[in-house]
UniProtKB/Swiss-Prot annotation:
Domain of life: Bacteria
Species in which this protein is naturally found: Pseudomonas entomophila (strain L48)
GO function terms (MF aspect): structural molecule activity
Signal peptide: 1-22
Subcellular localization: Periplasm; Bacterial flagellum basal body
Self-association and partners: The basal body constitutes a major portion of the flagellar organelle and consists of four rings (L,P,S, and M) mounted on a central rod.
Protein's name according to its UniProt entry: Flagellar P-ring protein
Record keywords: Bacterial flagellum, Periplasm, Signal
Annotated family: Belongs to the FlgI family.
Amino acid sequence: MFNARRLIAATLLMSCAFGAHAERLKDIASISGVRANQLIGYGLVVGLNGTGDQTTQTPFTLQTFNNMLSQFGIKVPPGSGNVQLKNVAAVSVHADLPPFAKPGQVVDITVSSIGNSKSLRGGSLLMTPLKGIDGNVYAIAQGNLVVGGFDAEGRDGSKITVNVPSAGRIPGGASVERAVPSGFNQGNSLTLNLNRPDFTTAKRIVDKVNELLGPGVAQAVDGGSVRVTAPMDPSQRVDYLSILENLEIDPGQAVAKVIINSRTGTIVIGQNVKVSPAAVTHGSLTVTITEDPIVSQPGPFSNGQTAVVPRSRVNAQQEAKPMFKFGPGTTLDEIVRAVNQVGAAPSDLMAILEALKQAGALQADLIVI
């Protein structure tokens, strides 16, 4: 059973709980059930300077506009289906509802065109309900857009586009109308979920909490979760968590990984990557094809025709690459230095790392994204 004396004693012990290279518990774990919720809505942006949807190609924009007018008692005359609304665009609106958000608070929203609008710059979002996955309305969005890009087009068809003008944001553009139920104050325990599951980190969290608050307060569920006993009183529970989230924990070392992005040529090598003894050589074959066409000119009065005769030259060159050797326990710095000495390009380094992994010499997970 928790009481005020135990919380005060734990607070006084916090000054002794800081490590040299530790991280706060709030930075490596989250409380189960305390999370953001996604909201989405559909609406109209008006006031555009001729950059709205072409309603002949996006009929849903005109349909939405007519439905809005009907709510104000305005009837669109029959036969006006081909009207062009150059300053209106159909958009999707989404936002993240933070945990513990209460009615009356505001959240930021993102507005994105779903038609063929060229730009949302200068537009205003009309009142749009934002719903959760359960279909209930949790917020109402409205306001003027902030767009970071722009689009300009000349009469001859030339155009310039900077960033993405078809999406924008409205800071504080949605007002919360309904709170999301939370199980934060239910039960006599809370579960801490590690952002990066690790058995060593989970054990160190349990040891640190039990050292501070007493044996048996924290128990490891698995490598990614730790269950801690918590006071039932909401006020004491908040004080209790403020102590826990500021505990300094020394996390376990991450698994050695090499990340390769084959599309961009980006390679990230983790600090704990090591290579077993291996010898590597990587040569490259360069094939050059040049086209040097010649013109065949017939002699005078020969009734011949001038013709272009193609002439291709193919040259193959094999570059000699030196062999370099990795000793036992080679570190990241030594790998990078050895590869740079032979002038390997990112594509060459990818091939070398993949070959080392296949040979069993790369002591790390090789992940291609």
